[in-house]
């Protein structure tokens, strides 16, 4: 069973979802099934079928989250440091073409969210950045072609989820 990195904040978020599913959603689905059963014939009972489908979804998500949390290697980013980019880094880059600054946080695959500038350690941009230092030029293959960036800053700080 392979381990994978995740920030401590990302892990807490997954654990919170898991607890909610186990203690709130699971109970609600059971109540929905019991209520639908009370309506009689189950063979043509749309409410019953919908409740059973939701139960299957909830149970699958619980199993998935249990697997993820069991394999997680929790990393406290605030305790990291260094001059090169690794998991947990917050990196500021300058796009060589547009000269615009962009910032990315390198996180685990289950906490990535590009709208919040959190990129997975397995993403092309993160793979290109790993091991680089301030002043290095990084080339990243994108759907629009190769993009070139200069590394401006590297920080290790807690993320807010």
Curated annotation (Swiss-Prot):
InterPro entries: GreA/GreB_C_sf (IPR036953), TF_GreA/GreB_CS (IPR018151), Tscrpt_elong_fac_GreA (IPR006359), Tscrpt_elong_fac_GreA/B (IPR028624), Tscrpt_elong_fac_GreA/B_C (IPR001437), Tscrpt_elong_fac_GreA/B_fam (IPR023459), Tscrpt_elong_fac_GreA/B_N (IPR022691), Tscrpt_elong_fac_GreA/B_N_sf (IPR036805). The keyword Coiled coil applies. Signal peptide: none annotated. GO terms for biological process: DNA-templated transcription elongation; regulation of DNA-templated transcription elongation. Pfam families: GreA_GreB, GreA_GreB_N. SUPFAM superfamilies: FKBP-like, GreA transcript cleavage protein, N-terminal domain. The keyword RNA-binding does not apply. Keywords: Coiled coil, DNA-binding, Transcription, Transcription regulation. Residues 43-68 form a coiled coil. Transmembrane segments: none annotated. One of its GO terms (molecular function) is RNA polymerase binding. Belongs to the GreA/GreB family. Necessary for efficient RNA polymerase transcription elongation past template-encoded arresting sites. The arresting sites in DNA have the property of trapping a certain fraction of elongating RNA polymerases that pass through, resulting in locked ternary complexes. Cleavage of the nascent transcript by cleavage factors such as GreA or GreB allows the resumption of elongation from the new 3'terminus. GreA releases sequences of 2 to 3 nucleotides. This is Transcription elongation factor GreA. It comes from Rickettsia bellii (strain OSU 85-389).
């Amino acid at each position: 069973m392979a381990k994978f990195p995740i920030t401590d904040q990302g892990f807490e978020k997954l654990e919170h979802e898991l607890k909610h599913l186990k203690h709130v959603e699971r109970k609600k689905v059971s109540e929905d099934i019991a209520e639908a059963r009370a309506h009689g014939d189950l063979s043509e009972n749309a409410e019953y079928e919908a409740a059973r489908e939701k139960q299957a979804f909830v149970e699958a998500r619980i199993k998935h989250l249990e697997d993820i949390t069991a394999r997680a290697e929790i990393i406290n980013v605030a305790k990291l440091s260094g001059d090169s980019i690794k998991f947990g880094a917050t990196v500021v880059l300058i796009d060589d073409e547009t000269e615009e600054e962009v910032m990315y946080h390198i996180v685990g695959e289950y906490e990535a969210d590009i709208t919040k500038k959190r990129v997975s350690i397995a993403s092309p941009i993160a793979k290109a950045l790993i091991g680089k230092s301030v002043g290095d030029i990084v080339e990243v293959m994108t759907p629009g072609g190769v993009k070139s960036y200069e590394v401006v800053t590297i920080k290790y700080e807690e993320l807010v989820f």
